[in-house]
Amino acid sequence: MSDSTPPPGILRALADHTTMTLAYTDGDGPQACAVLYALRTGTEDGYEAGPGDPVPALLFVTSESTRHGRALSAAQPAAPVAFTAQRDGQDWSGLTGVQGRGVCRRLDGGERRRAWRMYADRFPYVALSPKLRGAMDHTAFWELRPTWLRLIDNSRGFGHKEEWGA
C-alpha cells in the first residue's frame, strides 16, 4: 500500500505505544536503543502541515553524547534507521506492534519548540519536573519520518500484517 497517510490501524498502534526500539548503524556496526516518543499525526492543535509534510512523525529526545546521538548526528541530514514499537508482556494470540524504517533528522528553532510542546503533552511529567525540564533544554529533539510501516496484529489472525509505504 502506498498513500500519503498510513491506514488508521497503523496510526492507532503507534498512538497506543510510547516506547520504540530504534536501530541504527555506526562505525562499530549495528546497535539498538529504546527511546520514548510522541506521535505527530498532523491533527495536533497549533500544527499546520505543509505540502509534502510527512505524516506521521515520531518525535524523541536524545543527547548527542550518546552512541545513538552521535550516529544520528554523523548521518545528517537524514540518518537511516529501523524501529519497532510494541508493549511488553504480550502473548502470541494478542501480539500487536509496529515495525518500520525511515530517516531521522535533528529539529532546531521553531520545529524544536513545536516538538517540545507535543512531547510535553505526551509526557506531562517531563514539563512538571524542574530537573527533567532543565535536561530537555540541553537535549536534541529528533524527528523520525517513517518511509515504510508494518502493523502486526495477531488478534486478527496469527501473522496478520498491514503495510504502508511512503
Identify the residue ranges that each predicted region occupies:
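Short, low-complexity, intrinsically disordered N-terminal peptides in bacterial proteins
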Residues: M1-P7, E44-G52, A166
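Charged, gly/pro-rich active-site loop segments
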Residues: S2, G94-A166
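Charged, amphipathic alpha-helical segments
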Residues: D3-P8, S65-H68, Y125-S129
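Short beta-strand segments
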Residues: H17-S65, R70-L72, P80-R87, L95-G100
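Short helix-to-loop capping/linker segments positioned immediately adjacent to catalytic or ligand/cofactor-binding
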Residues: T21-T25, G89, V126-G134
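Short, surface-exposed beta-strand-loop junctions and turns on beta-sheet-rich folds
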Residues: T66-H68, Q90, G157-G159
